[in-house]
């Protein structure tokens, strides 16, 4: 969805936007999308596979109505709205391009690209670790030694980079931080809490 929306914004970019700044944001977005797709594809188990978080949430439903609310609201609607909110800084910057590219844009670009590299490295380290596992264990080497969830750290920094891009319009665009905060709440609060709770139950070497 983010990449599709970005391409749609590009339709009018020559008339309404700063092409260089838009190109920088597009680079970050496509780099992130390639990493995400590759990491999903190499671990895909087929159409019958369902994320354990979805299974857990739906398993708590006591009737069909609760099941519907969980499936439609928590699993589909809220994440989709969170992505739209997180894209606000990027969309705003495309339609209100501000001045020519300056140092803050390069800071945003560096943060965005670095964030995806953090995800790529942490993904590969976890992939290699899981291939040799015979029972649930906690990853404690590489980037995972310094952060419990380095992949999520990269995800948050990725979305934060678009907020930095939006500041090319000045501090008047500061309200767009709401998009980054929304994604932070989804990733760093909701997903992390669920993963840590599950790890405490399954891994004897995991500490809260």
Model-derived regions, located:
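Juxtamembrane helix-capping/reentrant segments at transmembrane boundaries
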Residues: 1-7, 49-74, 137-144
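Active-site pocket-lining segments that scaffold enzyme catalytic pockets across diverse folds
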Residues: 75-81
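A general boundary/transition motif marking the beginning of the first structured unit of a protein
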Residues: 42-46, 73, 98, 187
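A basic- and aromatic-enriched beta-loop-alpha substructure that forms the phosphate/nucleotide-
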Residues: 21-60, 64
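Hydrophobic transmembrane alpha-helices
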Residues: 4-36, 83-125, 130-208
